[in-house]
Amino acid sequence: MQNTCLMIARCLALATVSLAPAVCQAGSDNYNRAVATFDAVVKCYGDERLPLFRETYPFDDQLKVTYLSNEEQADQQKRFSYLWPFSGSLSAVAAIWDARLDPRFGQVLEQQVRPGLEMYFDSVRTPAAYSSYLNTAPASDRFYDDNIWIGLDFTDLYRLTRDPRYLEQAKLVWRFIESGIDNQLGYGIYWCEQKKNGKNTCSNAPGSVYVAKLYLVTGDSSYLRTAVRLYEWTRTNLQDPTDGLYFDNKSLDGTIGRAKFAYNSGQMMQASALLYRLTGEEHYLREARRLAAACYEHFFAAPSQPGRRYRVFTPGNVWFTAIMVRGFIELYGIDYDRRYIDAIQENLDQAWTNGMREENGLFNDDWTGQTRNESKWLLTQFAMAEMYARLALIDAEE
């Protein structure tokens, strides 16, 4: 396994070197930048023995993550990343492979990413699913949203390759997600299997996208019915009527967690666009466009630098931004209105040259390039690779 991981790192490094002249050209190098960013992740976060990644760079053996539901688990497990950041490797590789169909990334998927992902897989508890930490450690919580992101990627990989293994895995993950649906609050998916105290947009919005995509690749109408039901539940329970954006969660006592995150509204934008494609019902398209305008107003800031034409992504969780970008791209596939795609492209072009990206190929969180992070999170890097790859696919199709 050590030789395999090092071989992958060398192959990607060689690919980056061979593409380096193109990377210097602005606006048309999305694929090269995606490859270079993924290569930097392997170099800086990869392990020499196992197909796993560290959570941060530089490595911090005292790190305590803040996104779990269990403080004790956050104290105990530090050597490798948790599932959520690791799963970004699956999203990034799937997007890069989709953009160019380079067989090298099929090899990366099968030789590094999938073997690493299987180290989080828990078949002891039923239904089987991915745990938040390695299956060699004490049993850890299992999050419905973490598993949804993985199931989405396997569904996309099946669409890309028609390899039945990917569809089988996508369906297996969905069975776990279904176990997290009940009639508390009227319907909806919980956030965490072990902490069923509320239902979150981050489970239900991508849950709708996920099951809509399962319908797209299987034709099973039960998936479409579930996609619509999850979508309607989320709109009814978690949408802010004043601006159309989405709150974070609803507790079982009815309390609304009113924080607004880019990925939540972005996933409802993607769900709206997908459901329009699948049903032809105009109200879904109207809602997707409404959300696109609201996201552009709320999650982009007016530019402060001279010469910028478009609004700038607000600082914060870069992966949240990447998930929102999926929604803009889904809508673009319907109406081909470039205004939001051009804004995303300008942000990605600026990020490459304005100091957001450092000499080691890793990115900070500030899209203006003015603030640097001493510790760089794994998922931020995979999110950047994914965004460049998704824009590269648009380049290839035009």
Residue ranges and their predicted role:
Residues 93-96, 154-157, 211-214, 272-275, ...:
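The core hydrophobic/aromatic register in alpha-helical repeat solenoids, strongest
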Residues 118, 178-179, 216, 235-236, ...:
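Amphipathic alpha-helical segments of tetratricopeptide repeats
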Residues 28-92, 96-145, 199, 283, ...:
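CBM-like carbohydrate-recognition segments
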Residues 202-207, 211-215, 223-275:
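Active-site cradle of extracellular carbohydrate-active enzymes
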Residues 1-28:
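Bacterial Sec-dependent N-terminal signal peptides
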Residues 106-217, 221-225:
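Extended ligand-binding groove/face enriched in aromatic
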